[in-house]
From Swiss-Prot:
<protein>
    <recommendedName>
        <fullName>Non-structural protein 8</fullName>
    </recommendedName>
</protein>
<dbReference type="InterPro" id="IPR044393">
    <property type="entry name" value="ORF8_bat_SARS-CoV_HKU3-1-like"/>
</dbReference>
<dbReference type="InterPro" id="IPR046444">
    <property type="entry name" value="SARS_ORF8_IG"/>
</dbReference>
<feature type="domain" description="SARS ORF8 Ig-like">
    <location>
        <begin position="19"/>
        <end position="121"/>
    </location>
</feature>
<dbReference type="Pfam" id="PF12093">
    <property type="entry name" value="bCoV_NS8"/>
</dbReference>
<feature type="signal peptide">
    <location>
        <begin position="1"/>
        <end position="15"/>
    </location>
</feature>
<feature type="disulfide bond">
    <location>
        <begin position="61"/>
        <end position="83"/>
    </location>
</feature>
<keyword id="KW-1015">Disulfide bond</keyword>
<keyword id="KW-0732">Signal</keyword>
<dbReference type="InterPro" id="IPR022722">
    <property type="entry name" value="ORF8_betacoronavirus"/>
</dbReference>
<feature type="disulfide bond">
    <location>
        <begin position="37"/>
        <end position="102"/>
    </location>
</feature>
<feature type="disulfide bond">
    <location>
        <begin position="25"/>
        <end position="90"/>
    </location>
</feature>
């Protein structure tokens, strides 16, 4: 229990210094993630593998907006259920962290990333 409290505090401190969204979901149940991007912004979802700024981003959905479909990777199992809106199987990402890239432009020339932390209930 103490470890869980310490982890929660560390996550909160991390989120204060970086853009972060904490969301609650029931473990191993379908969960529709709330999009933390501002209204009228495009969002694209990734798993960030590694902790460095230059870490690899693995895209979770593909296709044009309005017709996006999940990309299923063997290493992630059935993590992504649907894309518009993003629905996942509520569990910690198999590797790395869940990231949403927000951009006002369709081509994501200028963007900012938001880390999404799932709190399991």
């Amino acid at each position: 229990m103490k470890l869980l409290i310490v982890f929660g505090l560390l996550t909160s401190v991390y989120c204060i210094h970086k853009e972060c969204s904490i969301q609650e979901c029931c473990e191993n149940q379908p969960y529709q993630i709330e999009d933390p991007c501002p209204i009228h912004y495009y969002s694209d979802w990734f798993i960030k593998i590694g902790s460095r700024k230059s870490a690899r981003l693995v895209q979770l959905c593909e296709g044009d907006y309005g017709k996006r479909i999940p990309i299923h990777y063997e290493m992630f199992g059935n993590y992504t259920i649907s894309c518009e809106p993003l629905e996942i199987n509520c569990q910690a990402p198999p590797v790395g962290s869940l990231i949403v890239r927000c951009s006002y432009d369709y081509d994501f020339v200028e963007h900012h990333d938001v880390r999404v932390v799932l709190d399991f209930i």
